[in-house]
Structure formats: structure tokens, C-alpha cells
Swiss-Prot record:
Monomer. It is an enzyme of class 3 (hydrolase). This is Streptopain. The lineage of its organism: Bacteria, Bacillati, Bacillota, Bacilli, Lactobacillales. InterPro entries: Papain-like_cys_pep_sf, Peptidase_C10, Spi_Prtas-inh, Streptopain_sf. Its main location: secreted.
Amino acid sequence: MNKKKLGIRLLSLLALGGFVLANPVFADQNFARNEKEAKDSAITFIQKSAAIKAGARSAEDIKLDKVNLGGELSGSNMYVYNISTGGFVIVSGDKRSPEILGYSTSGSFDANGKENIASFMESYVEQIKENKKLDTTYAGTAEIKQPVVKSLLDSKGIHYNQGNPYNLLTPVIEKVKPGEQSFVGQHAATGCVATATAQIMKYHNYPNKGLKDYTYTLSSNNPYFNHPKNLFAAISTRQYNWNNILPTYSGRESNVQKMAISELMADVGISVDMDYGPSSGSAGSSRVQRALKENFGYNQSVHQINRSDFSKQDWEAQIDKELSQNQPVYYQGVGKVGGHAFVIDGADGRNFYHVNWGWGGVSDGFFRLDALNPSALGTGGGAGGFNGYQSAVVGIKP
């Protein structure tokens, strides 16, 4: 074969190889998990779960109801099934990602109007997309001994929300965007940051007395208030009566009990510079660790750690250490949908962590901290931007 023909053949092979590697549709044909396969995966998982089966009289009692996620959360990325007898299963839509992403043995899954849940799920979507660049199925990771820790907040019945009565002392919405007129005159949501932090404080029933006042000015970019808007919390004067700050609220509590939780929520929100809104609020985890120590007198062991500084194994070891010491973890990330903050308060021993989302128990369950294929992480590195700039506040104790 002469050099000219050999060169043409080599170029043809390289072009063909480039086409295969650069064409995600071709790759998806090999690795996509269709709806039937996803449902079968959910059924197989349920059959292996004694806790889920315990809620049914027989296997025939268990029915699956597909949750319509919509947008980027739908279709080829993941499937969510609510279980008729209680609980849910989240299945990846691609075989290059972990088959099961999350589950619960009770309740149901609902991300509608819950920005922190939608944002966390969106991080799964981005990670699954990253995995689609690979040409190998998910093989799992080396078995790492993980503690089994039952939900710490559940053990005390702690399930807070962002509306009434938790938000009775948050700022009142003064103006709105088009289509949001019903929010005018209503109290702002507590925000997932304040809700997560307050739940951890209730777990510890600490402090009995506030330490330091705090004031700040709302960002002039906030569209819901007239500016300047200054907020102040007289935290140093507070006596937090944890007998009146209940683990959860149904609306039938006394006014004293309602005001006790709303005061705590407002103090926490202000102490972290909450950017209040009618249905959500945002703040950074660096402010959480500062507020817990400086304003509420928590131990100086409280500090923030960032996912990007750790390998997957070392990051999960940090979380495991906290849970083994009966210390719930404040967890936060940022994605396209927005920020998300929640509490990690348990582990099942199989790399799933129990999440309390702060929506009164809705969608609480066990979730993977990421959906990345180990091959996408490289050697020894963190997860780059594919873990939604995750951070955690650890060492939270009186």
C-alpha cells in the first residue's frame, strides 16, 4: 500500500473515531435507561427493601406512580416514582451514572415550588450529563465502611417549614414582580438557610441566651422591598425557651409557642444576611458558621468545608465523622435553578445520606451526595463544578 493510500485510510479511521466519540446520541443509544428499565430498577430496589415492603400487606399492594418533574429534570436524565404504600425511588436515566440516586421508605417526593430540592436535583442532571461523555457503565466505587446513623432530626421529631408560623416575624413583602400580587402584605419565607440552621439549633436545644445583636441592609437588587431596607435582630436580649420552641408545628399551638419559633427563625435569618423573598430566601454558608459562633455562642469548632478541597472518599469521610458524633451537618450548594441548603442527619451505610429539606418532611429521604461516575472525577481530585459548589458547616455543637 503506498503512502498516499495509507494516509487516506488513517484519516478515515480517525474521522470515524472522532464521530463516534463526539456524537452523544450514538452513545446514548448504548447507555440510555428507558422508562420500562427504570421502573424495573425501582421495583427491584423495593423488593430488596424490608422497610418499604413492611408497609404493604403483599407485593401486589405496592404500586408505582411516576412523578412528572418537567424541564431539565425529566426524561432521559432521571425518573422518580412515588410508592403507593409510602416512600419513593429516584432512578438515573443513564447507565453511566449510579442506578439509584435516592429513596425514602415513607412520605412522597414533590419538588414543585421547593427551590432547594429542585436545585439539588438539577445538580444530578448536570452530573449525569457529564457522565454521558464516558463510554463505560457505572461500576460503583470501592466499598468504604460507612456508619449507619438513623435520622438525628427524625429521632426528635424535628420537621420545620418556611411558612406560617415559622415566618410570622420575617419582613413583610412590600412590592412584587408581575403576577405575584397575592404576596404583597405577606411575610417573606424564612428561607432554606435559616430553616436548616434553626432545625440544627433545635436538635441541640441551644443556646438558652443569645450572644450578640446583628444588623444589615438588604441588597438594593432585592425586588420585594422598598430600599434602603435595614433589618435588626436584638439577639443579645433573647432568652430562647426550648420548651416553647417545638419540634414541629401543626397550627394548633399556642401563640407563645408560635412566636417562640418565629423569633428564632427571624433572628437566624437576619444573622446570616438573608436575602428575603415571598417563597424563598438565600444566604451563604460562610455566614452560617459565623452566626452560630458569634451571635449564638456555639463552639469554636464550627467551621465551613468545601467539596472542591476533597476527594469523594475524603469528603464523605468528613460527613460520616460528624454523623458518628451525633452532629447534624448543614449542607449547601449552588446550581442553575438557585441555591440549596438542607440538613444531612443520617446515613444508611450504603453511601446514601438522609436529607431533611426543611419542607415539613416532604421529600425527606436518603440521597447520594453526587451522581458522578468515578471515571469523570479523575485521579484523586475533587468534583470540580459538577457538585454545584457544595459546602458544609461541620463541628456544630454547643
